[in-house]
């Protein structure tokens, strides 16, 4: 590429182009991921025997973590939690504020997104065989926070906490983990990147 062509390519067309591209991109990804998880939270089924609803959030958390990397995913889930506490009605069932016994799962989402992002940055999302353990690890972290918080908030023993905060959800979350473990490697394949490649192919670098 000639110097003149490179200059034209870098020249800003609108005011937004004056901002660093990475900052604009990352901000949009963080806000978009938080909104996506808030949308999935509205896929909500309440059960009579537990204060914790069945939602689609877990799938969004796993996808955000592996697709965005740990920094952006962590920021997205912190935004989701803080905005929800501040009044944005995007917790399950359009709830906002402190959601009591189920809030541990929200904290678990942050930790799980960071963990999945950390693993993805080391290639865990490039094949199904490597994605499955990463997704399972994310699920374990969510349950560790969620069930512990549930037990402390409602003064439950371990068996009660597991029966209300783990057993009703494990089958559905296993399906979500399997979906996420399949989608990420498929996305890499569709982009044309090699399985173990971590930089763009020649000619595609910015």
Positions of PLM-derived features:
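Hydrophobic transmembrane alpha-helices
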Residues: 2-74
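Short helix-perturbing small/polar motifs within transmembrane alpha-helices
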Residues: 3-19, 39, 96, 102-151
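Interfacial loop-to-helix junctions that mark the boundaries of transmembrane helices
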Residues: 19-24, 48-55, 96-104, 132-133, ...
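Alpha-helical transmembrane segments in multi-pass membrane proteins
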Residues: 29-40, 61, 65, 76-84, ...
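Interfacial aromatic-anchored transmembrane helix boundaries in multi-pass membrane proteins
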Residues: 42-53, 81-112
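Membrane-embedded alpha-helical hairpins and interfacial helices in multi-pass inner-membrane proteins
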Residues: 50, 122-204
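Residue-level recognition of membrane-helix boundary sites in multi-pass small-molecule transporters
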Residues: 71-72, 103, 130, 160
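Hydrophobic/aromatic positions within or immediately flanking transmembrane alpha-helices
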Residues: 74-77, 162
């Amino acid at each position: 590429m000639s110097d003149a062509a490179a200059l034209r390519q870098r020249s800003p067309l609108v005011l937004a182009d004056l901002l660093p591209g990475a900052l604009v991109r990352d901000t949009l990804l963080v806000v978009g991921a938080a909104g996506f998880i808030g949308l999935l939270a509205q896929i909500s089924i309440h059960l009579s025997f537990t204060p914790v609803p069945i939602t689609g959030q877990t799938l969004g958390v796993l996808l955000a973590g592996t697709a965005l990397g740990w920094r952006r995913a962590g920021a997205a889930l912190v935004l989701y939690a803080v905005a929800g506490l501040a009044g944005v009605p995007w917790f399950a069932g359009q709830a906002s504020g402190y959601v009591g016994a189920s809030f541990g799962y929200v904290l678990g989402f942050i930790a799980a997104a960071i963990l999945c992002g950390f693993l993805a940055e080391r290639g865990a999302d490039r094949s199904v065989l490597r994605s499955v353990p990463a997704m399972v690890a994310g699920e374990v972290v969510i349950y560790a926070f969620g069930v512990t918080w549930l037990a402390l908030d409602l003064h439950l023993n371990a068996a009660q906490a597991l029966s209300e905060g783990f057993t009703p959800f494990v089958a559905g979350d296993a399906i979500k983990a399997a979906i996420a473990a399949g989608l990420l490697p498929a996305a890499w394949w569709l982009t044309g990147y090699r399985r173990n490649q971590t930089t763009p192919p020649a000619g595609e670098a910015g």
